[in-house]
């Protein structure tokens, strides 16, 4: 993979170079010392992935991510001194289009095979699989849907998701009568913090989905592990390692397919901004079962990958700008409740 480094600290750049050199198939394409340079380099010499620091002079990592995604979209991995100390900026960068985040390896660890360089390499490998993926979704068997459970809104998001989710959730009323379950492509290390972060922007309670959780009307559950979230035929949430070959964990396709075959009430599917194709086939499975499905439009998507794939295969009942998705959900659920 051709990799661009954006970091103003020489020691950090050297540490990243040494970690990248551990893999023969990776090479450093260029190094930028601030966000402005990074944007110019991405336009002139597009990399496969950018390793983006957060704190830099002139233009910081969040602003640089936003500008790159507007001018020369590519995969961006936030690599910063301490992810845990910069969670707000990390979520903001992910909302702008970054795919994931990891701590910067130290120079000493960069010479070894300790966890720090391996964590970075694992993230790069994961992004590589996503870029190469032509994922096919597996539809688990389940009984024919019947009535008896509340309306469920199943939402999938990836790059740009945190900002899109914030906008969608804050537009829903406190008495929203449906259950909401979200699968956002995010490492489990950030899931609890993201649930708390989203909880601060909505009138609905946002919690992580645990093994055995049950979707409830007026509440939001967020997938919280690196395994796949699924609904059982009894409407109970759980996690599974299978299928193992999916490029992103948790997989939106796996969850949407389980909703299509396992949820016994009415359901709506929403596929938001994101890179790749995850969620498109699952959304189509939901639509085939009679669910109303929505894909975010190109103009309001930070990364028009997943919703584009859904639109291309006819998976979406409607393709909407972000600010129209919440009103449409409210209207559709009101219509369903009158039936």
Swiss-Prot record:
Gene3D superfamilies listed in its UniProt record: 3.40.50.2300, Methylesterase CheB, C-terminal domain (3.40.50.180)
GO terms, molecular function: phosphorelay response regulator activity; protein-glutamate methylesterase activity; protein-glutamine glutaminase activity
Reactions performed catalytically: [protein]-L-glutamate 5-O-methyl ester + H2O = L-glutamyl-[protein] + methanol + H(+); L-glutaminyl-[protein] + H2O = L-glutamyl-[protein] + NH4(+)
First-level EC class: hydrolase
Pfam families assigned to the protein according to its UniProt record, in alphabetical order: CheB_methylest, Response_reg
Gene coding for it: cheB3
Source domain of life: Bacteria
Modified residues (4-aspartylphosphate): 53
Annotated keywords: Chemotaxis, Cytoplasm, Hydrolase, Phosphoprotein
Record PTM text: Phosphorylated by CheA. Phosphorylation of the N-terminal regulatory domain activates the methylesterase activity.
UniProt GO cellular component terms: cytoplasm
Localization in the cell: Cytoplasm
Task performed by this protein: Involved in chemotaxis. Part of a chemotaxis signal transduction system that modulates chemotaxis in response to various stimuli. Catalyzes the demethylation of specific methylglutamate residues introduced into the chemoreceptors (methyl-accepting chemotaxis proteins or MCP) by CheR. Also mediates the irreversible deamidation of specific glutamine residues to glutamic acid.
Protein name as catalogued: Protein-glutamate methylesterase/protein-glutamine glutaminase 3
Organism this protein belongs to: Burkholderia orbicola (strain AU 1054)
Positions of the catalytic residues: 158, 185, 278
Written domain comment of the UniProt record: Contains a C-terminal catalytic domain, and an N-terminal region which modulates catalytic activity.
GO biological process: chemotaxis
Residue ranges constituting the Response regulatory domain according to the UniProt record: 2-119
Location (main, coarse): cytoplasm
Family of the protein in this entry: Belongs to the CheB family.
């Amino acid at each position: 993979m051709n990799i661009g480094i954006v970091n103003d600290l020489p020691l950090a750049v050297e540490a990243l170079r040494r970690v990248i050199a551990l893999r023969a198939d990776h090479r450093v394409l260029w190094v930028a010392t601030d966000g402005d340079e990074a944007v110019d380099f991405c336009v002139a010499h597009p990399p496969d992935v950018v390793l983006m620091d957060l704190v830099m002079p002139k233009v910081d990592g969040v602003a640089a991510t936003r500008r790159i995604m507007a001018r020369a979209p590519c995969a961006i991995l936030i690599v910063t001194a301490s992810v845990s100390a910069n969670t707000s900026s990390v979520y903001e960068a992910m909302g702008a289009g970054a795919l994931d985040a990891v701590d910067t390896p130290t120079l000493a660890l960069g010479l070894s095979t300790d966890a720090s360089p391996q964590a970075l390499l694992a993230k790069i490998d994961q992004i590589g699989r996503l870029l190469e993926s032509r994922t096919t979704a597996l539809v688990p068997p389940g009984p024919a849907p019947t009535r008896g459970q509340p309306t469920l809104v199943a939402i999938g998001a990836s790059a740009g998701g945190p900002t899109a989710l914030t906008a969608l959730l804050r537009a829903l009323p406190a008495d929203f009568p449906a259950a909401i379950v979200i699968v956002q492509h995010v490492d489990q290390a950030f899931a609890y913090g993201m649930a708390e972060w989203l909880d601060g922007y909505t009138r609905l309670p946002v919690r992580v989905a645990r093994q055995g959780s049950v979707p409830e009307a007026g509440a939001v559950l967020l997938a919280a592990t690196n395994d796949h979230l699924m609904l059982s035929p009894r409407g109970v949430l759980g996690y599974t390692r299978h299928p193992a070959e999916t490029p992103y964990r948790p997989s939106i396709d796996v969850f949407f397919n389980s909703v299509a075959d396992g949820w016994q009430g009415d359901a709506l599917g929403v596929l938001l901004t994101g890179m790749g194709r995850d969620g498109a086939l699952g959304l189509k499975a939901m639509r085939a079962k009679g669910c109303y499905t929505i894909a975010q439009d190109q103009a309001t998507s930070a990364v028009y990958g997943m919703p584009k794939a859904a639109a291309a295969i006819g998976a979406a009942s409607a393709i909407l700008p972000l600010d129209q998705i919440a009103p449409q959900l409210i209207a559709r659920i009101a219509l369903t409740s009158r039936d």
